Amino acid sequence: MECPNCHQNASRVIDSRPSDENRAIRRRRECENCGFRFTTFERIETAPLLVVKNDGTREPFSRKKILHGVMAAGQKRPISSEQFEHLVDQVENKVRKQGVSEISSKKIGQYVMDDLADLDDVAYIRFASIYREFKDMSSFMKTMEDMMAKKEKGN
């Protein structure tokens, strides 16, 4: 592995441990030439996944895009960054378990909404208001009533 400090190819692994819920290996390395220590990650290479948008266009799947959306919905809510990351992990796992090369943005949005509903009611409503593109107050109220009924049923 090339040292990012002196660019020599002589390094050794001094520590190795699982990372990212056992989906990656984190390795601490030390350059045998200059002694510089650095970290590398080894991950399973996954097949490219395309998201089919509502207008039919396709774009690469992006964890960052999902994370940005849920963080915006959960702004000023008592949700930690670890909870946001965990939610995105759950959504990505559901998507990858489908075993397909393309998935609709609607399906991804539904996965996000399902997990947000369990995490925070306000974040769920905020996300739903954009994702579902409410046309009027009655469709918004229907979503709120459905969510409240689901919560009552669960208790």
UniProtKB/Swiss-Prot annotation:
Disulfide bonds: none annotated. Belongs to the NrdR family. It comes from Lactobacillus acidophilus (strain ATCC 700396 / NCK56 / N2 / NCFM). Signal peptide: none annotated. A zinc finger (unnamed) spans 3-34. The keyword Zinc applies. HAMAP family: NrdR. One of its GO terms (biological process) is negative regulation of DNA-templated transcription. This is Transcriptional repressor NrdR. Residues 1-11 have a biased composition (Polar residues). Residues 49-139 form the ATP-cone domain. InterPro entries: ATP-cone_dom (IPR005144), NrdR-like_N (IPR055173), RNR_NrdR-like (IPR003796).
